[in-house]
Amino acid sequence: WRDWMIGYESSHIEYVDPDGEIERGPLENSYQQQYQKRYYAKIKDWERGIERELEDLTTVMLTFSASNKNDLGGWRCPADHMRDIADGYQTAYSTLWNVLDGYEWDFAKVWEPHQSGYGHMHLAVAVEDPAGSISAEMFRPVMRSYVENTKPAGSEAHGLTTPGMGDAVSVNDDVGDLGCYIAEYVGMFGEEALERSISTQLFYATCWATGTRRVEFSGRAQDRIAREQFRRETGLRPEDRGGSTFDQWRGDESGGESGESGESGDESGSWAVDSICTVSGGSPTYSDPTAGGQRLTRIDGREGVDPPAHRD
């Protein structure tokens, strides 16, 4: 991971602009400070969006974790530990849909590093709750589903032995400092990634090796973020002019990022990725942008080498 990060210091990406000219800029990744600032802007846009659009807002924070020891008493492989949590979350998410059936809600999923170097997951949920009926106990089936389908996840750590769900589920009747909490979880403020503690870098390396995004927004949350960005950039409301201006703006934004052509079917007005290069001493060395990526492979027999510990 460190070698990969260091490689970004001299890496650039080249685009073909709408006039056919080559434009070059630094290649970025989500662990760099400038990228973190965009993450934070999105988080704050989501916070503003739910506060603006949900009149009777309730926020819920659910925390999913797992033991970092294996069944042999040793340390669990960090990648397997992260996958344990991610796989268990998928079953919990299905239960969450049932629990919140009939409500308008959206969420942000966030991974936070622990001082041990392992990670755990927070799910920040924003719910329109006009009757004030949302309580922590409503989410007991969600946490039970997670524990039952995640062998190294304990009942006590997920509030199942505690009335009110303990620290595993927290409910607030406003947005509060939700954006700041999420930013703190992700570690958006502070030192550059390669200057952080070894435990934090271990967590980053695990996210990188498993292809895990540290922050993800639901589709509805992404829509709110886009509307807030539109307000900020244009000074208009998304519903102005029947929403057509917002739709056009969003289409232009999407096309500009992806390099897709517009409605006319030609390439005019679009940007396209041309190549990736390393610049050293002023002379670029080019690479095929389609040749990279991660290749994930299961190791035969790994269950016997690193079996997850069972927690009641």
Residue ranges and their predicted role:
Residues 1-117, 129-312:
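Right-hand nucleic-acid polymerase module
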Residues 124-128:
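Short hydrophobic/aromatic beta-strand micro-patches
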